Amino acid sequence: MSCSTESRSISESDAYNKVFNITKKYMHENIIVYNKRIDSTMRGNVGIEIDAMLDALDDDRIAIVSPAYPSAGRTVVGGYLLVNGVLVEDTEMAVDSKNPIKISNVIDLIKAQSKRKIISMSIDIVRKSVKVIANFIKDKYEEGFRIFVCDMINENHINSISQAVLESKIKFIVADPSPLTAKISELSITPPRIMSREKYYAL
């Protein structure tokens, strides 16, 4: 199930209310994967909308966040968003007429809008085993972190993070342009069962 909020270029309060209300309306205990789709160049009310979905679900889950889309040239390294190897603030996105991006640090962008404790899942962690990544998530969850901003350069990182999120057994949402959500959703299906509409929810 997918709902379009058209909230990228509206006020923060309106964006929050749209995401919060739609999540409340359609949330269900059988949904495995909640996705807050975000722009791969971080335009819009990203932090606000992540908070809105987490607030609506109200079960102390985490947000796994990355604007990376490796196959489209979007990567995150050291917390910085690169577009075809160039910092996003040095691309045409910096002069976007509606949502100019002046900062390439993903954590700084989200911190400016979110009330939650944020941590970077750096490339040093992402390159390690699934078990190490899962333990990192669990340990930092116990320390109070609720938003995990993931470095991501290639498909291997997408696979490892996806497996680790599920292995951690911690409830989550995913905020990304789609590749991470797609992989987690794929791994959430136990063949030959087919995912029903109740299993996946995206905004």
Locate each region found by the language model.
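Short glycine-rich anion-binding loops that position phosphate/pyrophosphate groups of nucleotides
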Residues: S7-S9, D39-T41, E155, P179-L180
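Cap/lid and interdomain-hinge subdomains that line or gate substrate/regulatory clefts
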Residues: S13-A15, N21-Y34, S40-I158
